[in-house]
């Protein structure tokens, strides 16, 4: 076999190796970028949820000042906030890859949303409470925070969907499978059950 033939074979092998390498590096880097985007958006979700949790103690103390305010409603808010504290993942970086933990997190947050919604509806029955500046300020802050939560959840779902779509595309799906736990499918927020219905309040 001549030298030119050998060099030609070696060149072909090198070229194939380069092509295969590029076909892996590109999708891998895309997955890394999209995964980082999901993690960054999740941090924003945690921030707005924490902001809401921080408002609850002041809100509860303010509402306590209203005479004969429903104790059950206050208790429900306090207990819901406590449950949020029990399941908030904090330093757990893989919650977006863990459907069970993510579901517990969402259920706790949705429970607090429902409790706060009921509290605000009940507060309409107490004109003296609504007249206080502190309550009005907290109400505005809470409403703003709830809006931010909705926006950040939507953005998180969009980033998770972008990752999952890319992950399932060819040939990325094989690369994701090869790296196993590193590129697990991302979970989504689901609409809160009964969110389309106003909370029922007995008068």
Tell where the protein language model's regions lie, with residue ranges.
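A helix-centric hydrophobic-segment signal that preferentially recognizes long
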Residues: 1-203
């Amino acid at each position: 076999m001549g030298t030119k033939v050998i060099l030609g074979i070696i060149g072909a092998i090198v070229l194939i190796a380069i092509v295969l390498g590029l076909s892996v590096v590109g999708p891998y880097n895309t997955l890394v970028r999209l995964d980082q985007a999901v993690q960054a958006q999740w941090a924003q979700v945690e921030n707005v949820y924490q902001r809401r949790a921080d408002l609850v103690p002041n809100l509860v103390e303010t509402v306590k000042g209203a005479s004969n305010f429903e104790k059950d409603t206050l208790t429900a808010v306090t207990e819901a906030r406590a449950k949020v504290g029990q399941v908030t993942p904090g330093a757990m970086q893989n919650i977006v890859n863990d459907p069970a933990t993510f579901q517990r997190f969402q259920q706790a947050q949705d429970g607090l949303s429902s409790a706060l919604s009921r509290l605000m509806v009940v507060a309409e029955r107490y004109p003296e409470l609504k007249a206080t500046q502190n309550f009005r300020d907290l109400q505005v802050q809470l409403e703003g925070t709830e809006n931010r939560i909705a926006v950040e959840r939507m953005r998180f779902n969009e980033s998770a969907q972008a990752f999952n779509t890319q992950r399932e595309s060819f040939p990325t799906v094989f690369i994701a499978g090869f790296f196993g736990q590193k590129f697990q499918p991302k979970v989504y927020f689901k609409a809160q059950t009964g969110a389309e219905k106003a909370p029922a309040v007995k008068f």
